[in-house]
Amino acid sequence: MKMTTEEAFVKVLQMHGIEHAFGIIGSAMMPVSDLFPKAGIRFWDCAHETNAGMMADGFSRATGTMSMAIGQNGPGVTGFITAMKTAYWNHTPLLMVTPQAANKTIGQGGFQEVDQMAMFEEMVCYQEEVRDPSRIPEVLNRVIEKAWRGCAPAQINIPRDFWTQVIDVDLPRIVRFERPAGGPAAIAQAARLLSEAKFPVILNGAGVVIGNAIQESMALAEKLDAPVCCGYQHNDAFPGSHRLSVGPLGYNGSKAAMELISKADVVLALGTRLNPFSTLPGYGIDYWPKDAAIIQVDINADRIGLTKKVTVGICGDAKQVAQQILQQLAPAAGDASREERKALVHQTRSAWLQQLSSMDHEDDDPGTEWNVGARQREPDRMSPRQVWRAIQAVLPKEAIISTDIGNNCAIGNAYPSFEQGRKYLAPGMFGPCGYGFPSIVGAKIGCPDVPVVGFAGDGAFGISMNEMTSIGREGWPAITMVIFRNYQWGAEKRNTTLWYDNNFVGTELNPNLSYAKVADGCGLKGVTVDTPAALTEALAKAIEDQAKGITTFVEVVLNQELGEPFRRDAMKKPVAVAGIDRADMRTQRRM
């Protein structure tokens, strides 16, 4: 069948149902984007490519469907680097389209030329460059399939002079593989260990959400009366109201989850790669059960046993593996110490929820006084925990939320609770600042009838705030964005108070900036609040207005209390050896 290369490209997108593209328009992609309206593909023209990539991540995580990121070759697609690595560690299947400098001039250092394959090699699960115009549909189909199989972004690189050529090809067929279901022997061994366990604990990771395995994990938990922890930043991997839900592990997570998993004799780590940051000690508890039998289930075999000693490794889909383990459990599975375990889970969960609801302030380490001083300097300002409680009071149960990286968002890690998956978007293990805002826009595009609320500190928000100039245009959906204003890079400032004797370098933000006024200037709505009651009222109104098509930025002024440092494991106090003296600075010779 004869068609142009761009027609072939778009027809393959249609075959796969890819209806949304995020990026900035550029000449190298215009032959394709020209066909988007006819094809039923919406192009979301963003203010920056990094934000575009994070919108695509938020869209796909919220919907479970694939979207596309596309930009101009060279300085356009370089903006996708952070976003693609973020999506990679968020296990988000995305299509990244990188038009390349013309094939006949590659290697001559021409306009907007860079080696785009080398650039993204570590950012995607698969990449392929088109070598001949006739192979565009074949390669695109394969790249899309590889993204699904790898559960991560995949890249197609296309020299721009391959467009507007006539080719005679048949469109490729879609070949989908069944997800692996795990090995029978490993599943039988896992079922035996769980059947004999006296204190089984289930740890649900992102794979439970991605694989739609929440119900299956719940059935296992109820059969065993096993408490269920969620992985770091995966609070939506188990219903928070369930009697066996004990909250997230990891940084600023649930003390109940940490205390209970520390008692486990068998841990079923379901759909998780057990990344090391997610199991670091918290609240002074080194909770990972070093003598427990660990059953790790992950669809990627390379990640099983990578960070923890594993007794049984199962390469398989979380849903199918959980179903099979449940079927093979012994009739008396979970009976050993069942009543004592149920009572302890209830007591520990209740005590933590009560403690969490009464925690108002952050502690100082011995020998430091920053948090005490912050409260004394601004006694009328809210603390981060008071802010999070006010937020939880009005956040709709069905809402999708996003959080950014940083101090104030991190303090809130234990607070959000969900009844279903695909409700919690967090930056993940790449940890980029600036994620909260664009990702929630992407989620709203994918789920227009669901209320969405994004959260970011003032430093992180400043990285992606240029999207305020794009989302007020016709056709863009309304969102609600909460910005925590403490006028500092809080996480780095906490490090400085602990290890660098309050020698603050680069930690202070502009106190004269008003994001609410910037929102007004962009034709959006900006509100500033400084009390819990005002925050609750403003957030409730913003969510109500969102349904009417009004975007609101709620700027929350709070005190400068600082939470637990992110990397206590990686920091230490510096020691002067040679010493540094300003007098040693020399004047440079001009070029």
Curated annotation (Swiss-Prot):
Catalysed reaction equations from the record: acetyl phosphate + sulfite + H(+) = sulfoacetaldehyde + phosphate
Domain of life: Bacteria
Cofactor(s) demanded: Mg(2+); thiamine diphosphate
Biological pathway: Organosulfur degradation; taurine degradation via aerobic pathway; acetyl phosphate and sulfite from taurine: step 2/2
SUPFAM superfamilies membership: DHS-like NAD/FAD-binding domain, Thiamin diphosphate-binding fold (THDP-binding)
Family annotation (CDD domains): TPP_PYR_POX_like, TPP_Xsc_like
A cellular-component GO term for this protein: acetolactate synthase complex
Cross-referenced Pfam families: TPP_enzyme_C (PF02775), TPP_enzyme_M (PF00205), TPP_enzyme_N (PF02776)
InterPro entries on file: DHS-like_NAD/FAD-binding_dom (IPR029035), Sulphoacetald_Actrfrase (IPR017820), THDP-binding (IPR029061), Thiamin_PyroP_enz_cen_dom (IPR012000), Thiamin_PyroP_enz_TPP-bd_dom (IPR012001), TPP-bd_CS (IPR000399), TPP_enz (IPR045229), TPP_enzyme_TPP-bd (IPR011766)
Location relative to the cell: Cytoplasm
EC number: 2.3.3.15
Span list, region Disordered: 359-383
Biological process annotations from GO: isoleucine biosynthetic process; L-valine biosynthetic process; taurine catabolic process
GO MF term set: acetolactate synthase activity; flavin adenine dinucleotide binding; magnesium ion binding; sulfoacetaldehyde acetyltransferase activity; thiamine pyrophosphate binding
Entry's family note: Belongs to the TPP enzyme family.
PANTHER family assigned to the protein according to its UniProt record, in alphabetical order: ACETOLACTATE SYNTHASE CATALYTIC SUBUNIT, MITOCHONDRIAL, THIAMINE PYROPHOSPHATE ENZYMES
Entry-linked NCBIfam families: PRK07525.1 (NF005713), sulphoacet_xsc (TIGR03457)
Record protein name field: Probable sulfoacetaldehyde acetyltransferase
Source species of the chain: Rhizobium meliloti (strain 1021)
Gene: xsc
